[in-house]
Amino acid sequence: MKTKNIISLLLVLAMLMSVCACGSDTTPAAPNGSAETKPEYRITAKLTAADAENKELAAHLTENCVISFTNTSSDTWDKICLRDYAAANLELENSISDDKPYTPGSIREVKDSRGNALSFSVQEDKSVVYVQLPSPLKPGERTSVSIDYSTEIPCCFERLCWSPNGDDFAGENTVCLSQAYPVLAEYIDGKWNEAPYFTDGECFFWPCGGYEMTLSAPEDYMVISTGSEAQSADGTWTLKADNVRDFAVIAGNGFETVSYTHLRAH
């Protein structure tokens, strides 16, 4: 089992490394293409472990996600589009499973940078969510929204899942958190990207950005992610990645760590 878990951790690390790198309520922003125009995600999250003996009791994630973004188009935005891929993932999982249905990912509340509640609407495709901005966002202006969010994490083998018994990919009681948070959709040719979600292949895209997550996980869990990880004295994890399209997190208590020194000969 030790060898298997070491191999599993190496495979997970390879997957994470493969992720592509790429007043007023508003503020002026730098020219398009600069670091200041990219979306920034600041996520505070709590992961509750699942019961490995009862697959009906799913793992659960609650979080607050603050997205800072710039209108990089030539149009004025009165609303923005978010993609909630966790909701689409759970909706699809329910459609193919006879087990107890999972509760789809849910945006509880959206606020502007001043703490005022914003109206939002979930479309027929549950992954598409429109948020009404408090005032029109002109080209080049930057603002932020704060999102309270929660989702169950299904027992399956998907981008968002938990594995109770381990397999060739993940160790025992491993949680995979990919697309476990709302993201700003891509705005192209005067409209927001509403391409449908499906499990096979890469069906989604959104602007590259910076991510910082503060994650509270079960005490015995190891956490690895796209970018860097640091654990504080109180057990919380700080995870950071810059200029990436997707920010993935793997957590579990079945991993082993391996360290080595690489010597270069001349």
Question: Where do the language-model regions lie?
Answer:
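Sec-dependent N-terminal signal peptides of Gram-positive bacterial secreted proteins and lipoproteins
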Residues: 6-24
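N-terminal, polar/Ser/Thr-rich
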Residues: 22-63
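A surface-exposed beta-strand-loop module
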Residues: 60, 98-168
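Asparagine-centered strand-capping/turn motif at beta-strand->loop junctions
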Residues: 69-73
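Ligand-binding face of N-terminal immunoglobulin V-set domains in extracellular IgSF glycoproteins
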Residues: 77-81
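Short aromatic-acidic-glycine turn motif
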Residues: 87-96, 223
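Extended, low-hydrophobicity, Ser/Thr/Pro/Gly-biased non-transmembrane segments
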Residues: 148-250
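Conserved small/polar residues in nucleotide/adenosyl-binding loops
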Residues: 261-266
